[in-house]
Amino acid sequence: MKIEKYNLESSQVCIPIPENYKDCLTLIKSDRYRKTGKELSSMSVILNGLKHFNSDILFWFRLSQYKKGILWAICRLMYAHVSQRYQIQIPASTKIGYGLTLGHRTCMVINGGTIIGNNVNLSQFINIGTNHKTPAIIGDNVYIAPHVSIVEDVKINNNATIGAGSVVTRNVPENATVAGVPAKVLNYDNPARYILHRWETKEQ
């Protein structure tokens, strides 16, 4: 697994980039672990993904990140199909860390240049975009509630919580809970409280 590092305000976020299908399966395992708290075998991950082939968007997303061979073309087609079904626009080129959770799996638009860290929760009806500048960089252990919009060139630091309906126009400090239009810091109490079953990485 290749690791790319991106700067936040006071730390770095380390993003795994799969270099083979074994790496893709590790990423899928991390996503499953976030839901169940149990680390599954590679065979269990594959069988579960195929069993739910018409709905398992993260299974096809992770496999689409390794861009080689005939299998890649099949995975891209399946990912496009499932994405359209659930109205989720997350380009396969988007760099996302271990342990992604999609709440309710519906209606999300994320710019392909966005960087998303490890153990992040994305909820329904969120928009992370840009028109001209660099897209957002999101750190580790971040919870983004429903109906949140994050504008270009902001950094969401580690352990942040973004309340429902917020519009984020500036950097969010580490451990902060923010909400509102525009989003403002409410407190620094109990950071990352909604991030359950965290996948531990060597880089963390």
Region spans (language model):
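Accessory, usually C-terminal, subdomains that scaffold auxiliary metal cofactors
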Residues: 163, 184-185, 193-200
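Terminal amphipathic alpha-helical/low-complexity segments used for targeting or macromolecular assembly
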Residues: 1-86, 195-204
